[in-house]
């Protein structure tokens, strides 16, 4: 049985921080796998592990075709061969197939060889079709790839990649993704994209990635094959990429090229290093230029690795803070083609919206005109318009325009910064209930405000803002200080359950989870049997059984589609259970 787990821990935009475990070894995603050429080690795998790289990737075809490497790998295993105790993924020779037109191994042979040498994540011999290939070639290559996928599925004994191919034809990418999602694979790389990145065709890259993502199961990590330059990490993660790999850290170093988060510079152009990594802190550009070629290459490779690691950490911190779109916006300014790709990504509104959290740890900053097209903004406008039909009184907001007055305390309207200030006004006497009802309509959908029509709202003595919401002596909900949205109490959940028809805001769990949910224990994904497809990440939800009996209320990390598909990790962080 394959030892493989992937669960989501945090998210922003369509990006996610995940926990990936293979054969008892765990890495946090997004993660990058430095490419290791076993014939030429500029930085050793052991050094990479010490630098914090918990995964590496190497080429099983090179090992297979090199007698001394093959014999040793079969004798001691790939981990001892490379002196690396982290997760080792291997390619199959597909890159050589794309570059040189052929390989001397069959699909079955390379899959079996990968198992024999003890790799953690294997790859079958797919056919990478380059961009702009004739449609007929792309279709035929994909047909062969899917045939080989079926063969690999039958014989595999390890976790395995199933690469999505289809050249630059979005419909073929989506078709391939759906077909592979039906098979028993663990990770889905998006293949044959290196030529797009090498020619700065980032806009086309966005089309390829999104076409693939819409067809893939959301519970499997997605790997952007050959992507390893830090300037694209933020954009790629915002699209939903979990894994990267690249030999660029070494290839660029050999060519005296110096990576930065905004692009690449030639060593000869630099008078100062804009970096404080161990290499840049110790040496000047002039000192590196005067070094022997081999030593200079190694030090530049180490610098490039530090920049890669630093940018991935920056992306993850942005996810934690709800600032990923802001980082994407910033990085997009580093190259006109990247900026075009950013604008192209924002056109995929439906895909982006379903993955976008309903609330964030940080305020919305209008940092550009593109920020007004971020999914959190467009969703807020659409929901506000719905609320406006019931609460027509409006106020003018410098970013969002005319908004319902009774949403003015809530995210993102109150928690936003633009060129002009927006002053949040305290509720006037007797109006606090309208704020609660309007927010319920905004947060839970049409009709939800009825659950609070007789509510008494306690105001904070310090701020004058709504806080505790009660009715007939019972606690219904809390009006959260941080984002002006509602956290449900038991009585509030019961009322919402009554006014919202099934399946609205429901997460349905099986019989095994019912007693635990009632006791206020968290709900894990494997126990979810159904969910409202309109649920979005970080929504407050109603946990029910198959008979629609209310069991608990809590906050979900997943959207409705993910709740129905994920089998690992947390589904609902239960706040309160409903005892029988």
From Swiss-Prot:
Entry keyword rRNA-binding: no
Q: Where does Zn(2+) bind?
A: 275, 277, 280
Q: What is its EC number?
A: 2.4.2.48
What are the PUA domain coordinates in residue numbering? 504-579
Query: Per the annotation, how and in what number is the cofactor bound?
Result: Binds 1 zinc ion per subunit.
Q: Which domain of life is it from?
A: Archaea
- Could you tell me which Pfam families the record lists for this protein? PUA (PF01472), TGT (PF01702), TGT_C1 (PF14809), TGT_C2 (PF14810)
Essential cofactor(s):
Zn(2+)
The protein's enzyme class = transferase
- Disulphide bonds annotated for this chain are none
Where would one find coiled-coil regions in this protein?
none
GO MF annotations, alphabetized: pentosyltransferase activity; RNA binding; zinc ion binding
Catalytic positions are 91 (nucleophile)
Q: What happens when the gene is disrupted?
A: Temperature sensitive growth at 85 but not 93 degrees Celsius.
Reactions accelerated catalytically: guanosine(15) in tRNA + 7-cyano-7-deazaguanine = 7-cyano-7-carbaguanosine(15) in tRNA + guanine
Q: What does this protein do?
A: Exchanges the guanine residue with 7-cyano-7-deazaguanine (preQ0) at position 15 in the dihydrouridine loop (D-loop) of archaeal tRNAs.
Know the name of this protein?
tRNA-guanine(15) transglycosylase
Instruction: Tell me what organism the protein belongs to.
Output: Thermococcus kodakarensis (strain ATCC BAA-918 / JCM 12380 / KOD1)
The gene designation is tgtA
């Amino acid at each position: 049985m394959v030892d493989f787990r992937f669960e989501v821990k945090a998210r922003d935009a369509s990006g996610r921080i995940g926990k990936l475990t293979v054969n008892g070894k765990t890495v946090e995603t997004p993660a990058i796998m430095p490419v290791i050429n076993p014939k030429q080690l500029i930085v050793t795998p052991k050094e990479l592990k010490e630098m914090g790289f918990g995964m590496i990737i190497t080429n099983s075809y090179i090992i297979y075709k090199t007698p001394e490497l093959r014999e040793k790998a079969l004798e001691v295993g790939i981990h001892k061969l490379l002196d690396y105790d982290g997760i080792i993924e291997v390619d199959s020779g597909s890159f050589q197939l794309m570059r040189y037109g052929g390989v001397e191994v069959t699909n079955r042979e390379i899959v079996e060889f990968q198992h024999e040498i003890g790799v953690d994540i294997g790859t079958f011999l797919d056919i990478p079709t380059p961009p702009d290939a004739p449609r007929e070639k792309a279709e035929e290559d994909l047909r062969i790839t899917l045939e080989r996928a079926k063969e690999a599925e039958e014989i595999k004994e390890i976790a395995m990649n199933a690469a999505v191919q289809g050249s630059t034809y979005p419909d073929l990418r989506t078709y391939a993704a759906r077909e592979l999602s039906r098979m028993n694979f663990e990770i889905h790389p998006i293949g044959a994209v290196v030529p797009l990145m090498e020619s700065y065709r980032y806009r086309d890259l966005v089309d390829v990635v999104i076409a693939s993502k819409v067809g893939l199961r959301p519970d499997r990590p997605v790997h952007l094959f050959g992507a390893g330059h830090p300037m694209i990490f933020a954009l790629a993660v915002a699209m939903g990429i979990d894994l990267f790999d690249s030999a660029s850290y070494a290839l660029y170093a050999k060519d005296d090229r110096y990576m930065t988060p905004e692009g690449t510079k030639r060593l000869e152009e630099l008078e100062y290093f804009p970096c404080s990594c161990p290499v840049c802190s110790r040496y000047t550009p002039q000192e590196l230029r005067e070094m022997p070629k081999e030593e200079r290459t190694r030090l530049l490779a180490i610098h490039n690795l530090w920049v890669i690691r630093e940018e991935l950490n920056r992306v993850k911190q942005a996810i934690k803070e709800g600032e990923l779109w802001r980082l994407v916006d910033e990085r997009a300014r580093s190259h006109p083609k990247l900026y075009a790709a950013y604008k192209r990504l924002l056109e995929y509104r439906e895909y982006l919206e379903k993955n976008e959290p309903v609330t964030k740890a940080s305020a919305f900053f209008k940092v550009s005109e593109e920020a007004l097209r971020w999914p959190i903004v467009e969703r807020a406008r659409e929901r506000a318009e719905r609320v406006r039909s019931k609460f027509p009184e409006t106020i003018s907001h410098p970013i969002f325009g005319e908004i319902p007055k009774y949403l003015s305390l809530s995210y993102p309207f109150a928690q936003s910064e633009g060129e002009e200030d927006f002053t949040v006004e305290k509720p006037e006497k007797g109006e606090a209930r309208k704020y609660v009802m309007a927010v319920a309509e905004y947060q839970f959908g049409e009709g939800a405000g009825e659950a609070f029509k007789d509510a008494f709202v306690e105001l904070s003595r310090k701020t004058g803002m709504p806080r505790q919401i009660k009715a007939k002596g019972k606690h219904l909900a809390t009006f959260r200080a941080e984002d002006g949205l509602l956290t449900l109490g038991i009585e509030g959940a019961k009322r919402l359950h009554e006014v919202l028809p099934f399946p609205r805001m429901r997460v349905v769990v099986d019989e095994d989870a019912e007693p635990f949910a009632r006791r206020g224990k968290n709900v894990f994904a494997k126990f979810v049997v159904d969910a409202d497809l309109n649920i979005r990440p970080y929504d407050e939800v109603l946990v029910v059984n198959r008979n629609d009996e209310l069991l608990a209320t809590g906050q979900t990390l997943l959207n409705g589609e993910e709740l129905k598909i994920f089998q690992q990790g947390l589904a609902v962080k239960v706040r309160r259970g409903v005892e029988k």
